[in-house]
Amino acid sequence: MKIPVTLNGNKIILDAHSDESLMRVLHKNGCPSVKSGCSSGFCGACTILLDDKPVASCKVPAGIVRNCDIVTLDYFSKTEEYTTIMSGFQKAGIKLCGYCTAGKVFSAYHILKMPKMPTRQEITDYVKALSPCCTDLETLVNGIIYAIQISNRRQKRG
């Protein structure tokens, strides 16, 4: 099946079976940041932005992404938003293991884009299902709050 998508800013055609996982298809198409982990959507290793929302690509059948915009961590890591998130994580003392980075970064990105400042509890509720393999929940929440503060300061200057 031929599936037109925009992958990391480039219009391409994915060649895949409709029920094949998007994670597998992206990995075959040279996206090394899309990792295979738990295959149940929990670990965050395969997280991508699908139409600007974080999703576990291991749970998405390739057949439903026709004409969608897909962003992987490889591409996103070159953005100002990524720099902001990583600055917040660094301030909180977070050292990501590399395995779950996409899940944590894209979850933070989603929270940063919320129209109103979420409460600490709302942030906690949003990220508590992520794999805690390298970062405890409280530290992750602190890192996201720091990233929000950094983003707000940049917007006031800009």
Question: Model-predicted segments: where are they?
Answer:
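Signature of N-terminal electron-transfer/Fe-S-associated modules in redox systems
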Residues: M1-G158
